[in-house]
Amino acid sequence: MAKQVGIIPLVGTIDGVNFYMRKGKAVARKAGGGFTGKAIKNSTNMERVRENNSEFGHCSRVKKLFKDSLFPFLGKQRNEELQGRLMQLFISIKNADLVSKRGQRQVGLGLQHADGKSLLTGFCFTSFNLPTENGFYDAATTTYTFTEFAPKSLKFVTGATHLELQLGVVVLDLEAMKATLFSSDAVRVLKNGAPQAISLTTAIPNDASGYKIAVLHYRYLQDVNGAFYGFQEQKGFGLMVVGV
C-alpha cells in the first residue's frame, strides 16, 4: 500500500491500481487482492477461509444455544465481553476435536475429550467467582455438595442479608440442536450463619439425551420484611460451570 501524492486525491481503479481513502488519507494499492463472495466460495486459495467460516458458524450456533438455555440464571445480559469469552471458549473446545478434518471440527466431539471438558469446567460467567475449594460435583447423581460452606468467609455486597445457591444442569443435544435447563431447589444461607454442609441435587429425566453441563448459580439477596430481592449487578450474582 502506498500514499498518493498530488493536489487532488483519486478514488477508483486506474491501470490495475486501486485509489481510495483510508483513515482520512489517500492511498493506493494493486487491484485484485481483495476478497469477493465468489472467490471465497470457489477459489482454492480461499479454502482455509471457507474452513474457518464453517467452524466459526458452528461454534456461534452452539454458543447461542447454550447461553439462551441459561436465561433463568443470567437474565438479559447485554455483555459483549461475555459474548467474546463464550465464543472463544467454544472455539477452543472445537479445537479439541482431533477426529474430524479441518473445517468439520465440532464442539460435541471436542467435549468427548478430557481437554475439551477441562476447558468448559470452571468457566465463570461474571466477575463474582464463588470459592469452591470445599465443593465437588457428582455427575452420576447430578449433585453438587459443599462439605463446609462458611458464609462469613464471603464479602457480601452492601445491603445483602443472604446468599442463594442453586444447581442447574443443561442437557445440550447437539444433534437436535436443543438445550434444556433443569434446576435444583434453591438454598438460602444467612450472611452471618454458621458453616454448614449443603447438597444441591437436580433431577433429570431418564430419557434426556445430550451432554450434561452442570452450573452453579449463586446470588446475594436482601430480606425486606420476609420478601427476598436479588442483586443483578456483576458482583451481585454469579454462574460457574462445575462439571461436564
What does each of the following model-derived ranges do?
Residues 1-127:
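Long, polar/Ser/Thr-enriched low-complexity segments
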Residues 7-11, 44, 51-52, 58, ...:
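C-terminal tail/extension regions appended to the core domain(s) of diverse proteins
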Residues 91-240:
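Charged linear interaction tracts used for macromolecular binding and regulation
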